[in-house]
Regions:
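Non-heme Fe(II) oxygenase metal-center motifs and adjacent flexible, charged/small-residue loops
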Residues: 1-128
C-alpha cells in the first residue's frame, strides 16, 4: 500500500473498505455507549464545543485546573478497552510492538470548533 505524504502526514487513501469502515464505526459507537460523549470545561471557564470520549488506559480531560490524561471517564468508570478493529489499524500501519495507550474520540457537530493547535506538554512528540 502506497501512502500519500502531505506536510508530514501519511494519507492511506482507500485503506479501509466500506465494511471495515462500518466495523470501526460500530466499535466506536460501542465505546461511546460505555463512556458517553462529554464537553470538557476549559481553564478560563465555559465548555468546549467539541464532544469527547476515549478508549484505552487513558482519556483526555479538561477542567478549570487544566487539561490532562485521566484513567476514568468523568462519570467515574474506567475507559473501555480500545476496540479490536482500531488496534488492528494500529498494527497494520505502524508495525510496532508498542501498544496504544489511548484512543481519543472527538465528535464535531455543525457548531463545534477547534482551532489548529499542538499540546506542548506532551511527554513524547514522536507518537501520535
Amino acid at each position: 500500500m502506497t501512502a500519500l505524504r502531505l506536510r508530514g502526514f501519511d494519507i492511506h487513501k482507500e485503506f479501509l473498505g466500506r465494511v471495515a469502515q462500518q466495523e470501526v464505526l460500530e466499535a466506536v459507537r460501542g465505546v461511546v455507549r460505555q463512556a458517553p460523549f462529554f464537553r470538557p470545561e476549559v481553564p478560563r471557564g465555559g465548555r468546549m464545543s467539541v464532544r469527547m470520549s476515549a478508549a484505552g488506559r487513558y482519556g483526555w480531560f479538561s477542567d478549570r485546573r487544566g487539561y490532562r490524561y485521566v484513567t476514568e471517564h468523568p462519570e467515574g468508570q474506567p475507559w473501555p478497552e480500545i476496540p479490536a478493529p482500531i488496534v488492528a489499524i494500529w498494527d497494520q500501519l505502524t508495525g510496532l510492538e508498542r501498544r496504544p495507550e489511548c484512543c481519543l474520540i472527538n465528535y464535531y457537530d455543525a457548531d463545534a470548533r477547534m482551532g489548529l493547535h499542538q499540546d506542548r506538554d506532551e511527554a513524547d512528540f514522536q507518537w501520535p
